[in-house]
Amino acid sequence: MQTVLAKIVADKAIWVEARKQQQPLASFQNEIQPSTRHFYDALQGARTAFILECKKASPSKGVIRDDFDPARIASIYQHYASAISVLTDEKYFQGSFDFLPVVSQSAPQPILCKDFIIDPYQIYLARYYQADACLLMLSVLDDEQYRQLSAVAHSLKMGVLTEVSNDEERERAIALGAKVVGINNRDLRDLSIDLNRTRQLAPKLGHGVTVISESGINTYGQVRELSHFANGFLIGSALMAHDDLNAAVRRVLLGENKVCGLTRAQDAKAACDAGAIYGGLIFVPSSPRAVSVEQAREVISGAPLQYVGVFKNADIADVCQKAAVLSLSAVQLHGSEDQAYVNALREALPKQVQIWKALSVSDALPARDYHHVDKYIFDNGQGGSGQRFDWSLLQGQPLDNVLLAGGLAADNCVQAAQVGCAGLDFNSGVESQPGIKDARLLASVFQTLRAY
């Protein structure tokens, strides 16, 4: 145990002694009630578990979230999480034990106290502040310390997340009878990340152990792939860095998915309820799903999606005017717009409005060499055809700025998701007729995307 971790643990010992003086165990031990939220049970089940984390700062990134409001964060996490992790280390993570009761009152899930725990006092303190589980790190503790600390936790009906980061610690975790083992993909000795650690260590943990992959999980593609090795994930920084926390959680759990061709407020609500991030409004007069600005306003009133206006060889002034009056998040170009058009559009649009470009895929992948284009839509033909192209063309390509479109529905969306694009763009496959979305089909598609 050297470098960063050793320094943190040395400082933690000083902190514990000071806190014991300030808040002696005898002053609150009699008020401690056993936990009634069962951490181990919460992570069981057919679906992959998610421990979502409240984290203001970290040693590797500094401050991650300026407007850190634990109650608000928990109120969003409660819709998605199996358990909620709360950083309580003050010096390195700007955490606090005071965050634990706030989160516990804001969400019904078990609350994990995430700290560098080296003394039974910290576990009593965590339970007093309403934590239902605690982190014990084998990189910090010897076997005797671990046994003592986990016995204290279990005596308070708290769960233990046992963290390992190499083969030796993995073997110790098995010998110590750990029920839930977190594999930290970050090396706390030098703060580097390696997702291969989950792939290497998880298969050797054996049956009966719940495996949680921690650190460095940023995308839906990583989650889908690593879910073959792990029973769940602990995710913090990837979410905390985004202003729109709801969208950030959906991006990782479901992908950056869009429902296009919205014409009714109720369909926008159904798309949002199901799990979409983006809603598409088509301003191409020849489309059966075309809407006016007034209709678009009505659609937008239905749900707080991020709205994308779809245009085809439109006048730049018209695109900018609609983007402004509707507060669009992005404009999507579906015609033969060239680089000069994109340059002029970028100059005229507010900088927070992204530019997306749809590209038609037939028997080869088109180049993605536009400047000032934030995302690409790969579709078959001009869009709205309901036909798919040959997805095998996408193998081995970097696709983190691509949405996949064309004939997507419940029967092929998992296969589409496995291609590795940032997200999927649904339209005709979730409709009962052109422009009329079917809430049951929408729910079915997103349930299918979350069935891992």
Curated annotation (Swiss-Prot):
Any single Pfam family the record assigns to this protein: PRAI
BP-aspect Gene Ontology terms: L-tryptophan biosynthetic process
Region ranges (Indole-3-glycerol phosphate synthase): 1-256
Pathway the protein acts in: Amino-acid biosynthesis; L-tryptophan biosynthesis; L-tryptophan from chorismate: step 3/5; Amino-acid biosynthesis; L-tryptophan biosynthesis; L-tryptophan from chorismate: step 4/5
PROSITE patterns attached to this UniProt entry: IGPS (PS00614)
EC number: 4.1.1.48, 5.3.1.24
InterPro entries: Aldolase_TIM, Indole-3-glycerol_P_synth, Indole-3-glycerol_P_synth_dom, Indole-3-GlycerolPSynthase_CS, PRAI_dom, RibuloseP-bd_barrel
Taxonomy, superkingdom: Bacteria
Keyword Nucleotide-binding belongs to the record: no
Region (N-(5'-phosphoribosyl)anthranilate isomerase): 257-452
Stated role: Bifunctional enzyme that catalyzes two sequential steps of tryptophan biosynthetic pathway. The first reaction is catalyzed by the isomerase, coded by the TrpF domain; the second reaction is catalyzed by the synthase, coded by the TrpC domain.
Similarity annotation: In the N-terminal section; belongs to the TrpC family. In the C-terminal section; belongs to the TrpF family.
Xref: HAMAP family: IGPS_B, PRAI
Quaternary structure (record): Monomer.
Entry protein name: Tryptophan biosynthesis protein TrpCF
